[in-house]
Amino acid sequence: MKLFDSLANTFKKVEQGMSRATEMPLFEIQTLQGSKIEWSKFDGKYLLFVNVASACGFTPQYKGLQKLYETYQEQLEIIGLPCNQFGAQEPGNAEEIASFCELNFGVSFTLTEKISVKGVNQYPLYKWLTDVNENGIKSSSVKWNFQKYLVGPDRKLIDYYYSTTDPLSKKITRHFE
């Protein structure tokens, strides 16, 4: 009987933990072109948020991100968020960033205005992505450019991946296959 009670309590805790996940609020954010992101365009899709930079050792990941987007765009939207907080590796303005991404990598996924992903000016989206008290799943800290956060079609955080994780890694693509 004690074993049964112990198992029942374990399942109850797991169930409670699963129900803590909160849906991502629809934060207001502008694209590089200055228009507000319309979240309804992405209903039913996975969202991959990536803090990006043009002068980083991980910048070639734009190519993999574009390939990921082209392969899975029916079920995935990639949102690149330029950030200049790591080594000042994204100093450009909106026009320069857009031009760099298009000319060098053919980027056609969504790019936003430049934001802060940590610190006192942390953008609210990144507060939600990185704080278990906000997302109900886990806490993390953004370590460098090209850290990735995957949100499910239900708008709940699935996981995050450090910069060293290739965009085409099975860790990420297994969710869409």
Protein language model regions, located:
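N-terminal "domain-start" segment that seeds a small globular fold
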Residues: F4-S40, P124
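Amphipathic alpha-helical repeat scaffolds
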Residues: T31, N51-A55
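Conserved helix-turn-beta segment immediately C-terminal to the redox Cys motif
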Residues: K45-Y46, A55, T59-N84, C101-F105
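Thiol-based oxidoreductase modules, predominantly thioredoxin-like and allied folds used
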Residues: N51, Q75-A94, S108-G119
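Short, internal strand/loop/helix patches
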Residues: E95-W144
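Thiol-/selenol-based redox modules, centered on thioredoxin-like
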Residues: K127, V132-E177
